[in-house]
Regions:
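Conserved active-site "lid/cap" helical segment
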Residues: 1-71, 75, 166-178, 188, ...
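N-terminal extracellular/periplasmic Venus flytrap/periplasmic-binding protein-like
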Residues: 23, 27-32, 43, 149, ...
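Flexible glycine-/small-residue-enriched beta->alpha junction loops
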Residues: 111-169
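Condensing-enzyme catalytic core mediating Claisen C-C bond formation in acyl metabolism
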Residues: 1-24, 146, 232-298, 302, ...
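Active-site pocket-lining segment
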Residues: 54, 165-168, 212, 284-354
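Active-site-proximal alpha-helical scaffold in enzymes
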Residues: 87-118, 171-200, 263-270, 358-379, ...
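Conserved catalytic cysteine-centered active-site region
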Residues: 24, 56-112, 144-147, 158-162, ...
Length: 400
């Protein structure tokens, strides 16, 4: 097996729903990330890229069936460079990184681009087709922004429980109160705001120019959802989103809806020489898991255990663990099931509650964020992990 390195990782700023990135198609967001990634490695001939792996969760609209290939072409890569789109829901971007790393480790490729993209703002509405030419009655219209659609009636209802209700079930299981969740969310915003102020994201963000009707483009250079002014008092005023009576999950302690893209350059030793650069990190191991879907948010517990075991590491070896913050209850539930884990290394720059969670992009964003943190440290071990709808977890171990 070959060693696999992450040479660089870039991402767009994460836009809020109907925010600054609302006017940009997802394939254009993805192309921007790829274009900026390669611009930072000018010694690399783009024709040497052997595949582009891109994660995308919704895929019902302008993602255009195979956004990996479309984005590669829009980014100006040679037509000889293939592209593929992968879907593991919220972990699609991390799945793309893992698939690219696996291909390189096996010798099937030397240089690959991996990433993910989602525009939750531009996700379309869809109509199911009738099995009759002229159906009578009403037809249901589905939003593809988030949640289940056209679920098979044979599925056990607990397998497609709304994700927010699943977070409530996790809170019930681990007795995680509203105050704990709000305090965690506040900490996420504070850490993210501090990281922004310190320039911690500058090395990974590729600012996006936004065309205006008149005058020069406006440039978006920072994540839109971070609230430096967040407070427990403001969060306490929010009503429960999923259980009107006695619920603890709110818009304040859950991740928002977002738009964004991320891309990473992965290589073997030969490919590394072609870039003329020092890598950010080395890919060490990955792990995937599945559990009862109604507790989907706890699936990273086993995924991280499996990934660390493959890497020959333990929780005590970790310098950073980036766990996607779909819900505060879900993160706190995972931490409760890792008694040997030190929460001090958890999401040191804030997480998705503050930064945002553009589904298919988030896993690639997390991998890039871990890689950049390890590079700034000069050495260390990091993990990127996410929970996934329908009860799955995915984790990646990086080392430097």
């Amino acid at each position: 097996m070959k060693d696999v390195y992450i040479v660089d990782a870039v991402r767009t700023p994460i836009g809020r729903y109907n925010g600054a990135l609302a006017g940009l198609r997802p394939d254009d967001l993805a192309a921007h990330a790829i274009r900026e990634l390669l611009a930072r490695t000018p010694d690399l001939d783009p024709a040497r890229i052997e595949d582009v792996y891109f994660g995308n969760a919704n895929g019902a609209g302008e993602d255009n069936r195979n956004v990996g290939r479309m984005a590669a072409l829009l980014a100006g890569l040679p037509t000889s460079v293939p592209g593929v789109t992968v879907n593991r829901l919220c972990a699609s971007g991390l799945e793309a990184v893992i698939q690219a790393a696996r291909a390189i480790a096996l010798g099937d490729a030397s240089i690959a681009v991996a990433g993910g993209v989602e525009s939750m703002t531009r996700a379309p509405y869809v109509l199911p087709k009738s099995d009759r030419a002229f159906p009578a009655g009403h037809t249901e219209l589905y939003s593809t922004t988030l949640g289940w659609r056209m679920v098979n009636p044979r599925m056990d209802p607990q397998w497609t429980v709304p994700l927010g209700e699943s977070a409530e079930l996790i809170a019930d299981k681990h007795r995680i109160g509203r105050d704990q969740q709000d305090e965690f969310a506040l900490a996420s915003h504070r850490k993210a705001a501090q990281a922004q102020a310190a320039g911690a994201f500058d090395g990974e963000i590729a600012p996006v120019p936004l065309p205006q009707r008149k005058g020069d483009p406006v440039v978006l250079g920072a994540d839109e959802c971070v609230r430096a002014d967040a407070s427990l008092a403001a969060m306490a005023k929010l009503k429960p989103s999923f259980r009107p009576s006695g619920g603890t999950v709110t818009a304040g302690n859950a991740s928002p809806l977002n738009d964004g893209a991320a891309a990473l350059l992965l290589v073997d030793e030969e490919g590394l020489a072609a870039t003329g650069r020092e890598p950010l990190a080395r890919v060490s191991a990955s792990g995937v898991s599945a559990i009862d879907p109604q507790y989907f948010g706890l699936a990273p517990v086993e995924a991280v255990h499996r990934a660390l075991a493959k890497a020959g590491k333990g929780f005590g070896d970790l310098d950073v663990l980036e766990l996607n913050e779909a819900f505060a209850a879900q993160v706190l539930g995972c931490v409760a099931e890792w008694p040997e884990f030190d929460p001090a290394v958890l999401n040191p720059q804030g997480g998705a509650i503050a930064l945002g969670h553009p589904l298919g992009a988030s896993g690639a964003r997390l991998a890039g964020t871990v890689a950049h943190q390890l590079a700034r440290r000069g050495s260390g071990v990091g993990v990127a992990t996410l929970c996934i709808g329908v009860g799955q977890g995915l984790a990646l171990v990086l080392e430097r």
